[in-house]
A protein has these predicted regions:
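Short, ordered loop/turn segments at secondary-structure junctions
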Residues: 8-10, 33-35, 62-63
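C-terminal substrate-binding/catalytic lobe of Rossmann-fold NAD(P)-dependent oxidoreductases
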Residues: 53-174
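Short charge-dense sequence patches
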Residues: 1-2, 23-32, 96-108
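Rossmann-fold NAD(P)-binding glycine/threonine-rich loop
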Residues: 2, 6-29, 39, 43-48
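Short amphipathic alpha-helical face segments that pack within enzyme cores
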Residues: 36-43, 75, 151
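Conserved beta-loop-beta element that borders a ligand/cofactor-binding pocket
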Residues: 27-28, 32, 37, 53-59
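Glycine/charged-rich beta-loop-alpha catalytic/anionic-binding loops adjacent to active sites
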Residues: 22-30, 131-138
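Well-ordered, non-transmembrane segments within structured domains
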Residues: 1-4, 139-141
């Protein structure tokens, strides 16, 4: 039986274990994010990253979210890092004042990531790029959980065409 899983925060070890348990001829599809807009945002950030020396990720979620930063924010930072051969040149932790450690965000593969948890959000993320004289902001907002359904349906329809472990909705978006 093919399987479609949507959750956040699975470790690489857990993914390897899942890949090992997937029976031959079946597909285990894991999506850290089912919103097509969020997947496109990550792809756009990956494309922009080589052209900007500074990049930061800001993610906003409801106050009951169990992980910080979100899996989407972590993956975005990884994609930015992979697509360029430099870390952000934005001021780092050395600029944090005493008593405000963490104000510059968590560094994930050289990219500062900031997590905000508050009532009123479902899920939002923006990636801010900077270079001399310009900034580029790429933002995605989910205001309602119905935004996940097109990606869920795409995953369900596409899982029949794959074998083994497939990670990420972008693998099915043409």
């Amino acid at each position: 039986i093919d399987c479609v899983v949507g959750t956040t925060g699975l470790s690489d070890d857990t993914l390897r274990s899942l890949a090992d348990t997937a029976k031959e001829g079946t597909c285990l599809f894991y999506a850290p994010n089912f919103t097509t807009g969020a997947v496109l945002m990550m792809e756009f950030a990956k494309a922009a990253a080589p052209y900007f020396p500074e990049a930061e990720v800001l993610e906003f979620h409801h106050c009951n979210k169990k992980d910080a930063p979100s899996g989407t924010a972590v993956r975005t930072a990884q994609l930015i890092s992979e697509s360029r051969d430099l870390q952000s040149v934005a001021p780092g932790k050395e600029t944090e004042i005493e008593g405000a450690q963490g104000a510059r965000g968590a560094l994930i593969e050289g990219v500062p990531v900031h997590s905000i948890r508050s009532m009123g959000y479902v899920a939002s993320q923006e990636v801010v790029f900077g270079s001399m004289g310009q900034t580029l902001t790429i933002r995605h907002d989910s205001w309602d959980r119905t935004s996940y359904m097109p990606g869920v349906l795409l995953g369900i329809r596409s899982v029949k065409k794959c074998d083994g472990l497939v990670v990420g909705l972008e693998n099915f978006m043409e």
